[in-house]
Design a protein with these regions (language model features):
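Conserved pre-motif I regulatory segment
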Residues: 1-35
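Conserved C-terminal RecA-like helicase domain
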Residues: 61-63, 71, 78-88, 253, ...
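Motif I (Walker A/P-loop) of helicase-class P-loop NTPases
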Residues: 42-51, 139-144
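Non-catalytic terminal extensions of ATP-dependent helicases
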Residues: 313, 318, 332-336, 424-753
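Conserved nucleic-acid-binding Ia/Ib motif block in the N-terminal RecA-like helicase ATPase lobe
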Residues: 58-111, 171
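Conserved interdomain linker/interface between the two RecA-like ATPase lobes of SF2 helicase motors
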Residues: 148, 155-157, 162-174, 178-266, ...
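SF2 helicase catalytic motif II
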Residues: 106-109, 116-157
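Conserved segment of the helicase C-terminal RecA-like domain
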Residues: 351, 355-365, 370-411
């Protein structure tokens, strides 16, 4: 609630009601969860916390889901409070780690809580930006672990996009932390969004009009529609032509890197959005950034530079970081009118525009094409509408009538955004750190504190309540049918059936389960016989209606029994813990619930820790040369892109492959699936880079995008840093690892902050 004592302005901005409310709770030293639409100013609350704690002489941690957002925040606060006060930790970058303001990825914060909690023991506040990432299938567990292991003396600020189950998330955190969590929500956007579809013959239109036109062509094959010009494909050029006067700047989300580039190049053939003065500014900014890279060579750069001089650009993860920096800087200065980008551009980074366009409502998720979710849609659409500039933001989605399927479009209603779901997972590293720091009963308690278990218990209560209600209804109809059907046999059969189903739910012996299922089938046959019996003294219409109701109730009850049986994640996590613990014992990482030397090393490695530890224990990191070691570290966990060609090399990796096959076999035996990955597709390039070759010469042989190669090298640097930190007591290896890092972290691969 707002009162007269609330802070109403900050950094010259008049705070919105939700910002005032959040700041008021922070001033009372309370934890706050803010859920509000993308682009309404949640970040201003984070800035207030950071500045407040710093001015009071305390320490504060800001965590982000992606390194680009961490880097952006580091630059902002370095400029605001001075570089001595701000540090950054992102795995591959470490600057001023003891600073009072620490910017880091959420993974680093989780790792510090598990391995060296004393390093963050004096932190007063931690900020979880984009906390809805708890729902991310690959990384969501990191947010859960951070919240579980965070000391309850530490306060937190969670910033989330709009989520329907924010109360459930806050209640779970209260439950595990033992501290109150204040919820602040905002549903209205300062700059409202207008959503529409676009089809070249209809123009900017509605779903209703699209459906009406599509009905005319129902049943006609696509090739006929196109060959006879019944339907003309709608392109990005059609949409840009429609919005170029009055709707720019525009972010054009395209779920393909190749299409990002080809669309931008195609637009550049027809349009130039900049005047002479703007072109001069573009040239000045480009020169300022490229001065840091005198030998910058990229196949993309000449054509991208020509596009930038026209106010057109593209942005995706396959680009060199310096090229992305140039595009971002120009967009910030309002010198880009149309930017084709992939969805990563929408994560956290503050780049508002007037209009957001989608070239499709479906995306490839690594397995298949699927419709984008409402949350994904609004994460991107929320960039439309610039505060203080636009009265409304516009969101347009291209429709191809020859492919049209209304079920593949998000609802475009913010109130229908999907709820968060837990993605909790147990890694070998987490298990080793749990065993290292907690007693057995505390470990089992912690395993029950995850968000998945909390959500399951909540659903379980609802399921059991509904089962009780249905059971009462079943007994009522059972009594009715029993009176009409004759003896008491019907009611007895029902009671017996429910007893067996409850027993079946808790039975694990396969033979007993088969017998119980056979008993249920026998009872079902007898019940059906009674239900189908024609009774001349009974009104047959009423009896048929009651039988139908009874069958529906019984079917629903049986579905609920199955669902209730699925809702026991605590047992699932305990079993997963025991299976992985048994594997760690078999590998010699644990003895009598104590970590061995191998276990200690694995507890400090995050990702592919079994492969790394086994290699270390066999002396491989000591034996390989610096270039070979870099090639190997880049290969550990490397995931080649589809159809990527492996570049041949002469490094003997037979020992590593032997270990990898051994670990894969052990994982299949103990947990039923492998996790270790080793792919040497770019090992040769890492070897040559370490020996001093230029990045341009590597790209002549590279079978992947230049940005992907930089990412692979930086992942290798991250692993090398972890190994360096874990082997401080081995000065020879430690020195070699430092040399490895120095030779990898140079020129185009370095990050400038």
């Amino acid at each position: 609630m707002i009162n007269q004592h609330m802070v109403r302005t900050y950094r010259g901005f008049t705070l919105d009601p939700f910002q005032q409310e959040a700041v008021a709770y922070i001033d009372k030293n309370q934890s706050v969860l803010v859920a509000a639409p993308t682009g309404v100013g949640k970040t201003l609350v984070a800035d207030y916390v950071i500045e407040k704690i710093y001015n009071e002489g305390g320490r504060v941690v800001y965590t982000a889901p992606i390194k680009a957002l961490s880097n952006q925040k580091f630059k902002e606060f370095k400029a605001h409070v001075g570089e001595e006060a701000v540090g950054i930790l992102t795995g591959d970058v470490v600057i001023n780690p003891d600073a009072p303001i620490l910017i880091m990825t959420t993974e680093i914060f989780r790792n510090m809580l598990q391995e060296s909690p004393e390093r963050v023991g004096d932190v007063r506040y931690v900020i979880f930006d984009e906390i809805h990432y708890i729902d991310d299938p690959q990384r969501g567990s990191v947010w859960e672990e951070s919240l579980i292991f965070m000391p309850n003396t530490m306060r937190f600020l969670g910033l989330s996009a709009t989520i329907p189950n924010v109360d459930q998330l806050a209640n779970w955190i209260e439950d595990i932390q033992g501290q109150a969590v204040q919820i602040v929500t905002a549903s209205e956007r300062v700059v409202p969004l207008r959503h529409a579809l676009f089809e070249q013959s209809l123009g900017i239109t509605t779903m209703g009009r699209i459906k009406k036109k599509h009905r005319r062509y129902r049943g006609i094959p696509r090739h006929v529609l196109l060959s006879e010009d019944l339907v003309k494909p709608t392109t990005h050029l059609d949409l840009i032509d429609k919005i170029k006067d009055g709707y720019l700047p525009c972010l054009f989300f395209t779920f393909s890197r190749r299409k990002c580039e080809s669309n931008a190049l195609e637009l550049g053939e027809y349009h130039d959005f900049l005047n002479g003065e703007q072109k001069r500014q573009v040239k000045e900014i480009i020169e300022k950034i490229t001065d840091r890279y005198p030998d910058l060579k990229s196949e993309r750069w000449p054509s991208l530079r020509r596009l930038l001089m026209k106010g057109i650009a593209y942005h995706h993860a396959g680009m060199l970081p310096v090229l992305k920096d140039i595009v971002e800087e120009l967009f910030t200065h309002r010198l880009i009118s149309v930017l084709y980008c992939t969805e990563t551009f929408a994560v956290g980074l503050n780049f508002p525009c007037k209009t957001v366009c989608f070239d499709s409502s479906t995306k490839w998720d690594g397995v298949s094409f699927r419709p984008i979710s409402n949350r994904e849609y609004f994460q991107m659409a929320g960039r439309a509408g610039r505060r203080g500039i636009d009265t409304e933001g516009f969101v347009f989605t291209i429709v191809d009538l020859s492919y049209f399927d209304p079920s593949e479009f998000p609802s475009m209603k913010e109130q229908e955004i999907e709820p968060l779901q837990s993605q909790f997972a147990l890694t070998y590293n987490s298990i080793l750190n749990l065993i290292k720091n907690y007693e057995e009963e505390d470990i089992y308690r912690i395993l029950g504190q995850n968000f998945a278990t909390y959500q399951a218990f909540a659903e379980q209560e609802a399921v059991l309540t509904e089962m009780e209600m249905i059971q009462e209804e079943l007994e009522k109809y059972s009594a009715h049918l029993q009176k009409k059907s004759g003896p008491d046999i019907f009611g007895k059969l029902i009671r017996r059936k429910l007893q067996i189903e409850a027993q079946l739910h808790n039975e694990y012996n396969k033979r007993t389960k088969r017998r119980l299922k056979k008993d249920i089938r026998g009872i079902n046959r007898r019940l059906e016989g009674i239900l189908h019996k024609n009774l001349p003294h009974v009104d047959q219409r009423t009896l048929r209606r009651e039988r139908r109701i009874y069958r529906r109730l019984l079917a629903r009850y049986e579905r609920l029994i199955v669902r209730e049986g699925e809702l026991d994640p605590h047992e699932k996590y305990i079993q997963e813990f025991l299976d992985k613990k048994a594997l760690l014992e078999a590998l010699g990482y644990l003895e009598d619930d104590e970590l061995t030397a191998a276990g200690e090393l694995a507890s400090q490695i995050h990702g592919h820790e079994l492969l790394v530890t086994e290699m270390f224990m066999e002396g491989m990191f000591h034996d390989y040369s610096v270039p070979e070691l870099n090639a190997i570290c880049v290969s550990i966990g490397y995931e080649p892109r589809k159809n990527e060609i492996r570049i041949k090399h002469k490094i003997d990796m037979s020992g590593i492959l032997r270990i990898w096959h051994f670990i894969t076999k052990m994982e299949q035996r103990f947990i039923g699936y492998p996790t270790a990955q080793f792919n040497d597709h770019v090992a040769a390039l890492a070897y040559r880079w370490t020996n001093g070759e230029s990045f341009a010469s590597l790209l002549e042989d590279a079978a992947i995008d230049e940005g992907d190669l930089v990412f692979a090298f930086r992942r290798g640097i991250d692993l090398l840093r972890q190994l360096r930190n874990a082997t401080i007591e081995d000065p020879v290896l430690n020195g070699k690892l430092r040399e490895c890092i120095a030779k990898m972290d140079r020129d185009e691969v370095s990050i400038w902050l």
